[in-house]
Swiss-Prot record:
Taxonomic placement: Viruses, Duplodnaviria, Heunggongvirae, Uroviricota, Caudoviricetes
Keyword annotations: DNA integration, DNA recombination, DNA-binding, Hydrolase, Transferase, Viral genome integration, Virus entry into host cell
Database matches in InterPro entries: CB, DNA_brk_join_enz, Integrase-like_cat_sf, Integrase_catalytic, Integrase_recombinase_N, Tyrosine_recombinase_XerCD
Self-association state and partner proteins as the record states: Homodimer.
A Pfam family this chain is assigned to: Int_N
Name of the protein this chain belongs to: Integrase
Every Core-binding (CB) domain range: 60-147
Biological process (GO), any one: DNA recombination
Active site, renumbered: 207, 230, 280, 283, 306, 315
Functional note: Integrase is necessary for integration of the phage into the host genome by site-specific recombination. In conjunction with excisionase, integrase is also necessary for excision of the prophage from the host genome.
Amino acid sequence: MAVRKDTKNGKWLAEVYVNGNASRKWFLTKGDALRFYNQAKEQTTSAVDSVQVLESSDLPALSFYVQEWFDLHGKTLSDGKARLAKLKNLCSNLGDPPANEFNAKIFADYRKRRLDGEFSVNKNNPPKEATVNREHAYLRAVFNELKSLRKWTTENPLDGVRLFKERETELAFLYERDIYRLLAECDNSRNPDLGLIVRICLATGARWSEAETLTQSQVMPYKITFTNTKSKKNRTVPISKELFDMLPKKRGRLFNDAYESFENAVLRAEIELPKGQLTHVLRHTFASHFMMNGGNILVLKEILGHSTIEMTMRYAHFAPSHLESAVKFNPLSNPAQ
């Protein structure tokens, strides 16, 4: 058994070996570490070594800091658990090196292998640059957050590593004829809630999960308030009287899960969508038609709940007047004298 201090993070690690099994726990003080050790010693009949206090420059593995980030900050994020799972998988792919040995070169080598499909189930279908960039951003954020909390005292090992340039993905949206076909198939579904969920998404620009998990308390005459949003900010969007009258008048959650039913409805409607945009096409459709009908980009930002205008600007080109001066001032229409 041993109690040792990490000289970089200032914490104390108590290591207890009972019948060949190791139990390790970190403490803020030496006293707490020793108490843990003494309690463990009393609970075992195995022979143990005397306590040793060791100075060590070794840091825990990368996954230790990922878990620490989650415990101190990540669990407050709406996607915290999903992000933790991705980060743990990333640590595993990296071989979970000691955190003080992890550096930009190790990550750069990993990115190359990742894009080559080495860690993919199907090596012929490697991830896109966007996927690797998300991993990069997540891990960089771990070190930045821990540094701000004084849990990581050296430089961020990913400082200076640039993200890959990404191709802009197509934002698919539905035309009027597509909407009619889709709604018809949704209304014919065995899931009685599907048509209403889809109508809410199309009428408000809500994300699928926001509409699917609506409760009675979020609906008031001609308005819906979306909570538990991606930005963690509530937003209220007006709806028509017609849509309001269609919604169930009951307490608690209004709808059952309908994702699989929606997927089947899209197939029956023979609508082809880009990969990864199955339900999000409804949100894109709202935003695209909002701008095509002359809506204001700043108002759209508030309706969608975007944190920055840059996110909303993806829809600016749908505005009727967007870059219309190209028609007026091009050399075919108006050659310079």
